[in-house]
Amino acid sequence: MSYQIITDSCCDFTKAQLQQYDVTCANLTVLYNGENHSNFSEPAAVKAFYNELRSGTMATTAAANPDEWAQRMRAALEKDRDVLVLAFTSALSTTYQSAVIAAADLREQYPLRKIIVVDTLCAALGQGLLLHYACKKRDEGMEIEELAAWLEEHKSHVCHWVTVDDLSHLKRGGRISTTTALVGTMLNVKPIIHVDDEGRLINCAKVRGRKSAMEYLVKKFQETCTDFDTVFIAHGDCPEDAATLEAMLREKHGIKEVVTGYVGPVIGAHTGPGVLVVFFMGSKR
């Protein structure tokens, strides 16, 4: 095709997946132990990151800046290719706005090229799932403007249902109080979080125990899923729980493909180890 799809590393695709989909990627970064780390979800590196969190290491995150975006865009523009950007939700990061700034500058330098930036309103492998569909449409021959319109129409149907195992990280991020974290831990309370239509993380329920939390995720899948061809599952270094969740989903539905990966460091820094997420296309978020 005559255009290049570019995303950012919050999509949590591995380098191999990015190559498979022919997508280039702007990097967000995570700071811990005094060093900046790019947010690529290579399994060994992400597992090491979660082990750092378990040992008490604090991590902070930084958005992809305009220069990072411009570098990726310019590489395509110099090959006379248009650019379609799928960016991490603007509700959680300035990464999208940085892409908009970079695109505005480059349009002046490359007036004959199209540069379209989409705020996915998605995060982690939810962003990855939307990217999966975008690449499929591209490969089927959809032109850049038509694909951008398709993304705007369908992005609010990418469902993200999350359960967090360790409340201490939500406490550190200010999403729950110290008292709530303490009582919740004592009572084995597991919060349920989802990404709403504005791309925000919303606390929406509390259940007792990990099994009940996974059953809640399956319930939301049953209520709203509209496409059983492809489902993504992500985890914070708890592959056994991810496999259990997949089995629970497959028990009730004829899902063709389940893609499992890590919740990368940008989101994982805030949710901690043990986070578990299911992503799918649904009738509503």
Model-found features: residue ranges?
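Mixed-charge interfacial surface used for oligomerization/domain docking
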Residues: 4, 10-18, 23-24, 29, ...
